[in-house]
Each structure stands twice: as C-alpha cells, then as structure tokens.
UniProtKB/Swiss-Prot annotation:
InterPro entries (UniProt xref): MFS, MFS_dom, MFS_MdtG_subfamily, MFS_trans_sf, Tet-R_TetA/multi-R_MdtG-like
Molecular-function GO term, any one: transmembrane transporter activity
Principal cellular location given in the protein's record: membrane
Cell location: Cell membrane
Coiled-coil stretches noted in the UniProt entry, renumbered to this chain: none
Protein known as: Uncharacterized MFS-type transporter YuxJ
Species the sequence originates in: Bacillus subtilis (strain 168)
GO CC annotations on file: plasma membrane
Keywords: Cell membrane, Membrane, Transmembrane, Transmembrane helix, Transport
Family to which this protein belongs: Belongs to the major facilitator superfamily.
Length: 392
C-alpha cells in the first residue's frame, strides 16, 4: 500500500506544477483569466470528489476498500490520459470534473489501513503510510517539471496515466484486505442519519473535520498559483522544473517528520501536537509572501512541509480514537468529504484573491486560516477541560 500511494502521489503531482502553464498554451489569455481558471480547473476535481466520497465510503464498508482503490485508480489514469488531447480550457475543465468522480485513492487507502490498525499505534502507522504519499509528492513535481521541459505537456500526461495504472495492478496483485469477519459480525447497522447525529453530538469529531477542511483550504489555495509565483521570482527559464522544486520542497519537509509527528501524537496526545503544527504552519507561510528570491521561497516551503507532514495523520488518528468501531469507516469517509471540500475551496479562494489583489496576498490569508485552526482547537481543549473540572 505504501508503494501504491507513492506511485499515485508522484503521478498526480507530476501535472500540478504546470497546470496553469498548460492553460496558457491553449489560447491567448489574460493573467487574470489564467489565474481564475487555474483555480477552477484545479478545484472542480475536488468538488466532484466531495459530492461522491460519502457513497464511496459506504460502498467500502459493505464491499471492501480494495475495490474502491482499483476503480478510482483506473478512472484517474484514464482522465489524465485524455487531458493530453484537449484543445480548450473547457475540455480540460470537463476532464478534471470527470476525474473528481473517481478521485480518492489516497484517502481511501488511509481509511483502509486506519480501520485495520490498533488505536494505540494509529498515529505512527498512518504517519508511515503518509510517508509514501509525501515521498511521491517530493519526486513527482520534479520529474513532471523535467518531463514537461524536455518532452512537452502532452507526453507528460501519457506517462502519468501509465504510472497510475501500474499502481492499480500493484493493488490488484499485492494488497490483501482483512475483512475482520469476527468483528463485523457483532456490529449493528446504522443509518446515515444516525451516523451524522453521532458526529454532530460529539464536538471532538466535527471539530477535527472542520480542521481537515481548513488545512486543505490553506494548502491548496496556493498550489495552482505556485508556478506563476515562481515565474515572478525567477523568470521563465526552465519554469516547469523550478516550479516542481517549489512543490517538492514542501514534500521533502513532510517526508522527514511525518512519521515522527504521528508517534508523538500517540504518546502525548494528537490535539496537543496539532495545535503546535498549525501555529508553525501559519508562521512559515508569512515569509513566503515576502520572498524576494526563489531560494527564500524554497527554504520556507521546506519548513512549512515539516509542519504539514503531521497534520492529516494526527487528525485521522484522533478520529480513529474517538469513533466507535461500528461506524468508524463511515466517519472516516465523512472526514474525507471535508478534506475534498477544502481542496475545492482552496483553489477558488486563491484564484479570487490573487486576481483581485496579488499572489502574495493569498499567502497572508492562508497563514490566517492555519492560525484560526489552532485557535479553534485550543478553545475546544479549554472547554473540555472546564467541563471535566465541573463534573468532578
């Protein structure tokens, strides 16, 4: 599963650094048009994924996660393959929309491994799995940038599609899902309404889901614009490659500490680690807005990645601890929905802010989002401590 996550993450991030550059080649557009449509094309995938992911989650509970992994992987591969043939931004938008219907390979793999992991070691295990995704996101943008500069965008789409389909074969022949029949036999069937009611009556769960949305909104607000920002700092020479470096710097930082943050969360509490990581992420975004050179941007993208690497594994582990086993799969599925919602809102937010102000302004707004997330989690912690004190 680690290898499959690595290949899928590497392949999908191969096309991200030059997506806005690809739009520019489709016609003669203004900068504002490219910035807006970079956000739209980037975000529509995750809007569709947000709408359909609860159905994938329920299907996984009933039929198994492996089938979802194979279906989503094949769909992603086909969608990216046909992107190499588009002649307009609207065709690209439609294919990204179709891709959203089957996007969810990596979140589904996290849900599958989480459901089969003891709660006491959930953070460390998910952090290890996260390293596969992060490793792929580290090498993917660099490889995609080099391929795009050398062979062009079209062949890069074809290569990406082939690698993702190889991951599907890896899951088919190399992954064995444990159905845990002895546990599922004791479970009670809950309706979707009952599961939602449970979530809404347990703040520890829905606050974590809101945090997932905030984190993804902040992280994805700048990603479609990063190539344009690198162009402002460095110029057009080998732009796809240096844009890939900016993406990979974040991945390298995450790779170094993803497993460590999960381990610390298991030992000292996931919420405590999350507050520190959110504050650090907020702090490291501000210098990116003030960067005067590509090297400065790369340094702080790397530092941001060190904080970012532990956020989603700690949140998933915290939900894993809080949710009863009988509804755990579906609860994690709703968290995936909030994750995709953040993936939708982020590019839209970044595109709107950058087109009306500057790309630098997007960094400031993102820093505020991470800071707000830390404050929200701290307030929840304080309220829980006060309620425990009154009860005792």
């Amino acid at each position: 599963m680690w290898l499959a996550n690595f290949f899928v993450s590497a392949s999908t991030t191969m096309i991200v650094p030059f997506l806005s550059l690809y739009i520019e080649t489709l016609s003669s557009f203004s900068n504002g048009f490219v910035q807006r449509w970079s956000g739209y094309v980037f975000g529509i995938t995750f809007l569709m994924a947000f709408l359909v992911s609860p159905f994938w989650g329920r299907f996984g509970d009933k039929r198994g996660y492996k089938k979802i992994l194979m279906a989503t992987g094949t769909g992603i591969a086909l969608s990216i393959f046909f992107m190499g043939f588009v002649t307009s931004v609207y065709q690209l938008f439609f294919l990204r929309m179709a891709m959203g219907l089957v996007t969810g390979f990596i979140p589904t793999s996290l849900a599958m491994i989480s459901a089969q992991t003891p709660k006491s070691s959930a953070g460390k295990t998910l952090g290890t799995l996260q390293m596969g995704q992060v490793s792929g996101s580290l090498f993917g943008p660099l490889l995609g940038g080099m391929l795009a500069d050398r062979f062009g965008f079209t062949y890069t789409f074809f290569i990406t599609s082939f690698v993702i389909f190889s991951s599907v074969l890896l899951v088919l022949f190399g992954v064995k899902e444990k159905h845990l029949a002895e546990k599922t036999a004791k479970r009670t069937s809950y309706s979707r309404k009952e599961v939602l009611s449970y979530i809404f009556h347990h703040p520890a769960l829905w606050v974590m889901m809101l945090l997932t949305m905030l984190i993804q909104t902040g992280n994805f607000s700048i990603q479609p614009l990063l190539a344009l920002y690198v162009n402002e700092l460095h110029g057009p020479v080998n732009l796809a490659f240096f844009s890939g470096m900016a993406f990979s710097a974040t991945g390298l930082g995450s790779l170094l500490l993803a497993r460590k943050w999960g381990d610390l969360g298991d030992r000292y509490g996931h919420r405590r680690i999350l507050i520190g990581l959110l504050l650090a992420a907020s702090f490291f975004f501000i210098p990116q807005a003030l960067a005067s050179s590509l090297s400065v941007l790369l340094v702080f993208r790397f530092l941001f990645g060190m904080a970012m690497g532990g956020l989603l594994p700690c949140i998933t582990a915290a939900i894993r601890v809080q949710a009863p086993g009988s509804i755990q799969g579906e609860v994690l599925g709703y968290n995936v929905s909030f994750r995709f919602l953040g993936n939708v809102l982020g590019p839209l937010l970044g595109g709107i802010i950058s087109s009306h102000f500057t790309i630098s302004a997007t960094f400031y707004v993102t820093a505020f989002l991470f800071f707000a997330g830390a404050c929200m989690l701290w307030i929840m912690q304080k309220l829980r401590k006060d309620s425990y004190a009154k009860a005792s």
